[in-house]
Amino acid sequence: MTAAAFLLAAAVVSAQQNRADAPLVVNVVNVLPVQGNIYMLVGAGANITASVGRDGVLLVDSGTAAMTGKVLSTVLQLATALTASPAPIHCVGMHCPGTPYGWSSPSINAIIGSPAPPKPIRYIINTSLDPDHTGGNERLSVLPAESKIVGVTFPPVGIAPSAIVLAHENVLRRMSEVPEGKKESPIPVGAWPTDVYHSASYKLSEFFNGEGVQIFHQPRAHTDGDSIVYFRYSDVISAGEILSMTSYPVIDAAKGGSLQGILDGLNHILDIAIPEFRSQGGTMIIPGHGRLCDTGDVANYRNMIAIIRDRIQDMIKKGMTVDQVKAAKPTADYDGLYGSNTGPWTTAMFIEASYKSLRAK
């Protein structure tokens, strides 16, 4: 990591530490260096994974539509900070490098020593079709030069004329579905994936920022189109909605999700990840929501899901109804960490979705 990039990320951490008692700041995209080429962007909806380097920028998920301007501004700042400029050259004269070839002069040296422009966003990989994962697709993937977003004028350099938006084919199928009684999908065409894969795994055809990028389809997990993205050299996994440190996993049964699929996805992540020592360090995992994780965190979350599954499955075998299962509180010892009685995904909703998923097996 360059000094400029370190200072950019450290400024966020320092500001948060110095204002520990201050009110929570919203509508801000924070940057967390993970390891290797990988950075975690927090505050734009779902967590965004960014690979930034010599080949440009690759994003895993794009956040909400409302935060697109802040995401782009943050990505451009990060890409600029990571563009290592040559050391300034002040030498002029016969003994300076390049003089025999006729290109040593104050003007030429200034050009050589100037920083390179930031590289463009070249890929966006969607781990699911949720709006907080795909909301920025349209404006981040195709953005005309000199456009203005939230009062910031972006130069022609650093903005891709067209980035590839990649996802599993089921994401495109569901985003392009036309609701009954309607003439077109409510999701604009510009937000749809431009490239899809349909196999159990997929990899970019060449190294990106000096490493291989591998994508795994996880069927019937949060939905039927979930992807896990693995950066092989940086040793970082982007887990999407399969892993959340702020809630129980969201099971969207209407879109092909299931509790067992979530559990299978967590086991898949643990199969890929290698800890450094005692399940700590080593492979780092970026969840769909919440803090950065290591193997131990994923294993604890997996164990929690397995225990709750077994409890609900046992209650189903005893003939208990969904209301009886809710009353029995099979999640009680984990509610302090992941439970909620309000918001878009409550504990009761998780229990009901798990019950229906296990009954359908």
Predicted segments with their positions:
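Bacterial N-terminal signal peptides
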Residues: M1-A11
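Boundary at the C-terminal end of the N-terminal hydrophobic targeting segment
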Residues: V13-A15, A20
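Conserved beta-strand hairpin/beta-sheet module of binuclear metal-dependent hydrolase folds
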Residues: V31-T99, P106, S227-E241
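Metallo-beta-lactamase
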Residues: P33, P155-P219, T223-D224, Y233, ...
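Active-site metal-binding motif and surrounding structural segment of the metallo-beta-lactamase
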Residues: D55, A66-A163
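Active-site-proximal loop/helix segments of hydrolase catalytic cores
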Residues: G212-E276, C293
